[in-house]
Design a protein with these regions (language model features):
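C-terminal capping alpha-helices of c-type cytochrome domains
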Residues: 218, 284, 337, 542, ...
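Long, ordered, helix-rich scaffold segments
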Residues: 547, 551, 560-881, 900, ...
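Beta-propeller domains with acidic blade repeats across secreted/periplasmic ectodomains
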Residues: 193-593, 841, 845, 893-895, ...
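Aromatic-lined ligand-binding clefts that engage carbohydrates, nucleic acids, or primary amines
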Residues: 60-83, 113-115, 168
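Bacterial N-terminal signal peptides
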Residues: 23-33
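C-type cytochrome heme c attachment motif
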Residues: 541, 880-895, 903-906, 912-922, ...
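N-terminal pre-domain segments of enzymes
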Residues: 37-49, 175-212, 566-582, 847-854, ...
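An acidic-aromatic loop/edge-strand motif
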Residues: 37-48, 108-191
Length: 1020
């Protein structure tokens, strides 16, 4: 990636060349010389392992007398430098490079600069710059860049001239000096990208991009232009962007032939806050707010003057406002409009009878719990969903559902649909946590999201799995590179955006049967890089926006600047695999034509495919059969002998059959159980039987006893997945011995998530307990959680996002609610005897020293002080200010804090200095609907303001004080209305008791993510 400053310099030199008739040779010599002045951060490989050691060398000639030689060198994390085999310096602080005078060490002829560098953890890199000043005043500069060579093995003489570096590799460059996360350490710059002045988006020089690509910052939005959240491209290649702010107009951006901003104009029509934009059918479709509230609007130019002049309101979606509301619009290959919605939106009541997706439900065998903090309380399935509509928005079909809160989606070149779904970050540390992930969205697909603890595990056959799990983050825009001018690998990639941790990732997919599997890599990374949406222009470049929640917005351009290479011809084996994948997808599409439609040919066509080894084919075939009257296929399902076909058909019958057939259904499920089934088939059988009990009711006593008899010998199993299902079923049937067996698994569980799973299910067991068992169970709540571990996969998800693991905000309350449910199963005598264990240990809050008022701080008080955040801040004073300002009372930070507000561990990835401080001094300027209070107006005229955490048929419960957790219950019969509050739950004036220096230390502490070795805390 080239720096913006250098690009401007090149432009200036070009102008000078034209005016003064510079020779082309001289011009490029100047550019080459200037480029060579800037060292790059390099490493042996892209992804460094913890504690790895790597070796680097660069040979260079010296001709003439050297009057001065100065080396500047640093490495993340340690480096020892050698000149001609002699050790010259060691450094273990990459934020403060070593400067060494080598004048006496340089010799005429060949010299070699070498370095041994060690990584501690995370990303690793080496930076070096050697400046030679000759006696005649001329200079030569040797910098770290990909012309060096590197090795992962130490060899005799490796640091000396003349060493044969056969087998040594070209290192990987992460970017030139100034790139995040290191910054310009030579000039003393900060580790994160510079924030720039007010109204300045993160400079392109602060971003890291895949080798061969270049990023440019085209425009930084002014306050009037707003904080951008969505983007579309019209038929003329112009970009249309939407600010998030209320009543801020949409903007249309015209690009010149070089991809630079030539014109920006407002769309002066009353539509705004567009979570989705689509230009199609000579119209601009807007998912946002307008004269008739939140819904789907269409803008048209009716007189041909190239200005939108008409607004049509097409359709309303109840609950469609906000960040969990109605989102992106995409034109499908069938020329239908597809529209994705978040989990707070209700499915339209006028769905077409031909909708592909039906028959979804909670489908929980044991009672689930709502979110511990009350988020999404009372929200019923189907979760986030996609509808398909005609261009007028009239015919509306439910296409797929069961995501959490997918924001955007796109179709690949083969016409397949994919989305990037969000996680519920408050679930971190629980067995029901689902990471952010990419889904292949197919007809009638259910992806298993249910609120609270009810998320389906990926192996449930009545749902579909992800293409790839990404980890932690906040998904925003997605787009395939199909229309890009990128190399073939990236034209096929799905680009996905993570707002929370400042990254655009490229997902590379491989066909797998009728679907795909995937791998991913970081494509563009920055801090902050609050990415929101992307498009590919007519020039094949990627254009992306930043913004959201009032943060600084910007428009960027990504182009491929590397050497083009001819695509590799696929092998015969690859061509065969591709043909098979195309055929599998074609079969799936044929089966999908029967979804939602009664067709006399459907059962006979689909039935043979119930036995397919491809899960996606079985799923499509089952849904084709479920769309037909049950009486046409019920007997066939009960009589089927092929294991795969039988399990799939009986799953359909469990979902749609009647109580009268239940015992026979369970008997048929046991036909090959267990010896005739592999693990996947056992899991399908267990889920099908659970669905029968959920939807058809508890079976007869005789059948129940037979079920216990068949399951009990298999529990516990060597498979954690089988144990998860067997545990629930045996508790459901109150099987003798299930409590003791489950406590045994609890004792052996290696991760907190697995322990919590067994604790969660055991809370439902009302019988089979001894007092010893009860003591074992309740003792778990009082254990030392510091000893608990998490899976390697979980730890990696956090590491990939550049942060440490932290408990989800709802985890403590989930645990508390599990204990409360378990206590409810005790007899009075048990409750008395176990009282000390049940009570546990009370946590006494540390007293906060009373502070005096200092000043009512404003944002302008700090405008000239942001450069003081670079270095020399105090970690201890920042942490103390964090406590004094009561931040931990409401916010998760690392693995501490409350849950009333958002987790701010990764705040530096999405907020620059100015945006972050603004949220502290003016918390009500932007209030996320995820943390928004409601104002309840009672019939007696009084108001109650707080966060809704519980709702039942006759009452609601609000947290009215986020600092103390005080709750107020309001009877529904007393409520006249309820409205969203425009006032942030975060109290104003929290910084008024801090000095300016303390506030700067506080900002540095938050931006560090709680890491003491952050560059901001290094000495000046």
């Amino acid at each position: 990636m080239r720096e913006v400053g250098q690009l401007k310099l090149e432009t200036m030199l070009k102008a000078r060349m034209n005016s003064q008739r510079f020779s082309l040779v001289l011009f490029f010599a100047l550019i080459s010389s200037l480029s060579a002045q800037v060292p790059e951060w390099i490493w042996h490989n892209q992804n460094a392992a913890d504690d790895e050691v790597r070796y680097f060398r660069k040979e260079f000639p010296v001709s003439g007398t050297v009057a001065k030689a100065t080396l500047t060198i640093a490495a993340d994390n340690q480096v020892t430098a050698y000149l001609n085999g002699k050790k010259i310096v060691s450094n273990d602080n990459w934020g403060t490079p070593s400067r060494v005078d080598l004048t006496k060490e340089i010799k005429p002829g060949q010299n070699v600069l070498a370095a041994q560098a060690k990584n501690e953890s995370g990303i690793a890199a080496l930076m070096a710059k050697l400046v030679l000043t000759y006696a005649d005043g001329k200079k030569a500069t040797i910098v770290s860049d990909p012309t060096w060579v590197s090795s992962d093995k130490e060899a005799a003489g490796w640091a000396e001239p003349g060493f044969a570096a056969a087998g040594w590799a070209k290192p990987v460059s992460f970017g030139k000096l100034g790139v995040a996360p290191w910054g310009d350490v030579i000039a003393g710059g900060q580790a994160s990208a510079p924030a720039g002045p007010a109204g300045q988006a993160t400079p392109a020089a602060g971003l890291t991009v895949v080798d061969g690509f270049k990023v440019e910052l085209l425009h930084s939005a002014s306050q009037e232009e707003g904080s951008w959240i969505s983007m579309a491209i019209d038929a003329k290649g112009r970009l249309i962007v939407s600010p998030q702010g209320d009543k801020q107009p949409l903007l249309r951006i015209t690009l010149d032939p070089q991809g630079q901003v030539a014109k920006m104009e407002k769309i002066e029509l009353p539509v705004w806050t567009a979570m989705g934009l689509l230009h199609a059918f000579d119209s601009l479709y807007v998912s946002g707010n307008g004269p008739q509230g939140t819904g789907l609007y269409r803008l048209r130019d009716t007189n041909g003057d190239d200005q939108y002049d008409q607004v049509d309101f097409l359709r309303k979606f109840e609950g469609g406002g906000g960040e969990h509301g109605s989102h992106a619009l995409v034109l499908g290959p069938d020329q239908m409009i597809y529209y994705i919605h978040g989990n707070f939106v209700k499915v339209p009541s006028d769905l077409s009878p031909a909708s592909q997706h039906k028959n979804y439900a909670e489908d929980q065998l044991l009672p689930r719990q709502e979110d511990g903090n009350g988020f999404g309380v009372g929200i019923k399935p189907p979760g986030s969903f996609v509808v398909r509509m005609d261009r007028e928005g009239k015919t509306c079909e439910l296409y797929a559902s069961g995501m959490r809160n997918a924001y955007d989606f796109d179709f690949n070149a083969a016409g397949e649909m994919f989305t990037f779904d969000s996680d519920m970050e408050w679930d971190w540390g629980t067995p029901w946590y689902r990471p952010i992930r990419v889904y292949h969205l197919v007809s009638a697909g259910d992806y298993g999201f249910r609120e609270g603890t009810g998320k389906f595990p990926d192996y449930y056959p009545d749902s579909l799995p992800p293409v790839v799990d990404i980890g932690v983050g906040s998904p925003t825009g997605v787009k395939f590179g199909t229309r890009s001018a990128f190399p073939a690998k990236y034209r096929k990639a799905l680009f996905i955006m993570d707002w929370s941790y400042g990254r655009i990732l490229a997902v590379h997919m491989t066909p797998a049967g009728a679907s795909y599997t995937g791998m991913f890599e970081n494509f563009v990374v920055g801090k902050p890089l609050n990415v929101t949406d992307l498009e590919f222009g007519k020039d094949g470049a990627m254009y992306f926006t930043t913004g959201g929640r009032g943060t600084q917005a910007g428009l960027y351009r990504v182009t491929f600047a590397g050497a083009s290479t001819a695509p590799r011809s696929p092998s015969a084996e690859e061509r065969k695999a591709e043909r098979e994948a195309v055929a599998a997808r074609a079969l799936r599409h044929k089966l999908e034509t029967f979804h939602g439609k009664v067709d006399s040919h459907a059962v006979d066509f689909a039935w043979p495919h119930l036995k397919s080894n491809d899960r996606w084919i079985r799923y499509a075939a089952r849904l084709a059969i479920e769309s037909q009257p049950v009486e046409l296929w019920q007997k066939r399902a009960l009589d089927e002998r092929d294991v795969n076909a039988s399990l799939t058909a009986l799953l359909a019958l469990a979902r749609l059959g009647s109580k009268e057939v239940e015992d026979e259904l369970i008997e048929s499920l046991g036909r090959s159980w267990p010896d005739g089934m592999n693990e996947e088939q056992k899991l399908e059988a267990l889920r099908a039987s659970s669905l029968a009990y959920i939807r058809l009711g508890r079976p007869s006593t005789e059948t129940s006893q037979e079920v216990i008899k068949s399951l009990d010998p298999l529990y516990p199993s060597a498979s954690s997945r089988l144990n998860r299902e067997l545990c629930q079923l045996l508790i459901y049937f109150e099987a003798p011995g299930v409590v003791r067996k489950t406590l045994g698994l609890l004792a052996k569980a290696e991760t907190e998530e697995e322990q919590l799973l067994y604790m969660f299910h055991l809370r439902n067991a009302r019988s089979g307990w001894s007092m010893e068992d009860r003591r074992t169970y309740f003792s778990w709540f009082n254990r030392d959680r510091a000893q608990d571990k998490h899976s390697d996969e979980t730890v990696k998800w956090f590491r990939d996002a550049g942060r440490d693991y932290g408990d989800g905000a709802s985890l403590p309350k989930f645990i508390s609610n599990i204990r409360k449910d378990a206590v409810a199963t005790l007899t009075d005598a048990e409750r008395t005897e176990l009282a000390p264990l049940i009570a546990g240990q009370k946590v006494v809050a540390k007293a906060v020293v009373q502070r005096s008022f200092v000043k009512d701080w404003k944002l302008d008080d700090f405008t000239s002080a942001f450069d003081q955040l670079n270095k020399g801040r105090s970690f201890e004073k920042g942490r103390e200010a964090f406590a004094v300002a009561q931040c931990l009372a409401c916010h998760r930070f690392g693995n501490e804090g409350g849950s009333t507000g958002p987790d701010i561990t990764g705040a530096a990835s999405r907020f620059n200095h100015r945006d972050l401080l603004e949220t502290l001094v003016d918390p009500s300027k932007v209030v996320s609907d995820q943390y928004q209070n409601i104002v309840v107006t009672k019939k007696d005229g009084s108001d109650v303001t707080g966060r809704l955490v519980e709702e039942s048929g006759d009452k609601i419960v609000l947290i009215t004080n986020p600092l103390t957790g005080d709750r107020t219950t309001v009877s529904k019969q007393d409520i006249r209305k309820r409205d969203p509050s425009k006032i942030s739950p975060m109290p104003e004036g929290l910084l008024t008791i801090l000095s300016k220096e303390e506030i700067l230390d506080l900002l540095a502490y938050i931006e560090s993510g709680g890491k003491k070795d952050h560059a901001a805390f290094r000495s000046r």
